[in-house]
Structure formats: C-alpha cells, structure tokens
C-alpha cells in the first residue's frame, strides 16, 4: 500500500518535516511504500474557480501552476494522504491552502477521487493556533469522503526553531501512534475490499 506525506512548510528540514517523517516511519516498517513530497516553497496559485476541471475531468487543474498536477497525481495514487503544515496566523501555509483548494475541487470534479482514502493532518506550532490549522486540513478531507483516523491526541507538535519539535515527547508518541493506526486501518480497508470483490465474483 502507498502513503504520501506532503510538507506545506517552505522551511526544508523544519519541524513540519520532522513530524511527517515520524508518521511515515511506522508505515515504512509495516511494509508500506512511503513517499515524502515537498510543496512548501513551490509556486502554487490559489484556485480561481474557473471550473475547467469539471469540463476536462482529467484529474488535473487547468491552471499551469508549478507542482500541483504532479502532486495531485501522487495523491490520487496513494491509499493514505498525510498533510503537514506550519501554523501561520492560526492557519495553514499559503502553499497548503492552495493545495487544499485545488485538490479538493479536482477530486469532486472527477467523481470523488479521494473518497475512501485515509487522510491525516499534522501541524507544527510554536504556541497557539494549531487547532485551527488542523481543522482547515480536516475540512477538506471530510468534505471529500476521506476516512480520518484518530490517535492518542490531536496532531500538533510544538517548536519554533528547526528540530525543536523533537523535544516534544508527547508529539513523537502521537505521531508514531498515528502512523501505526493508518497502517492498521489501511490493512483493514484493503482486506474488506478484497472480501467484497471475492463475494461479487462468487455471485
């Protein structure tokens, strides 16, 4: 199975990246194909509501912005999508917001490309505002039919300077548990789908 972690922070090697990789580690250990994708720092224009995606239905955005369509292709191919963002004025980064708006609309325009996938939000925060950023990501997931698993708590990690989040032991435990939960849930969904397919063949 495939899991993709998308980093919405423009600061490479920063706290958001650290958290995302903590989630991916148990998935890799469970035999999943995992991939880390850097979106923060790339030029992704905001959605212009041109609805070109409803006309073409090719799972792509008609705007030729850098990086989005490649990222969308990876999201569609994944069984689990983990989106990470720093907290900017109590919300997600500009790149993450553009990704959410584009991908959510393209998914809907193409009949629900994200429906039935697993999705998780991960947030790096210095002090406050992380809950709102967490909600912003989950709003897109829940409106797209994505299955959002819980963990030991919500999914923030606290820190400002690069690597500071590694001192947040509770966050580390939570991210590890989140990765393990995604692995378990993915296997359960996969097994259920196989049983349904086998039943259809017998019928």
Give the positions of each predicted feature:
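Helix-loop-strand module that forms the ligand-binding subsite of alpha/beta enzymes
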Residues: 62-147, 153
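N-terminal beta1-alpha1 ligand-phosphate binding loop
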Residues: 2-32
């Amino acid at each position: 199975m495939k899991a993709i972690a998308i980093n919405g922070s423009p600061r490479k090697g920063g706290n958001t990246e650290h958290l995302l990789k903590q989630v991916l580690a148990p998935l890799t250990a469970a035999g999943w194909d995992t991939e880390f994708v850097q979106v923060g720092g790339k030029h992704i224009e905001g959605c212009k509501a041109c609805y070109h995606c409803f006309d073409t239905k090719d799972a792509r955005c008609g705007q030729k912005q850098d990086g989005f369509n490649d990222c969308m292709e990876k999201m569609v191919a994944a069984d689990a999508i983990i989106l990470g963002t720093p907290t900017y004025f109590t919300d997600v980064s500009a790149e993450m917001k553009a990704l959410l708006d584009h991908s959510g609309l393209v998914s809907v325009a193409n009949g629900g490309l994200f429906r039935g996938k697993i999705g998780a939000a991960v947030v790096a925060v210095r002090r406050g505002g992380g809950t709102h950023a967490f909600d912003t990501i989950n709003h897109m997931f829940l409106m797209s039919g994505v299955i959002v698993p819980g963990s030991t708590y919500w999914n923030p990690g606290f820190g400002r300077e690069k690597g500071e989040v590694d001192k947040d032991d509770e966050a580390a435990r939570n991210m590890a548990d989140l990765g393990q939960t995604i692995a378990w849930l993915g296997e359960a969904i996969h097994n259920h789908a196989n049983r349904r397919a086998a039943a259809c063949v017998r019928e």
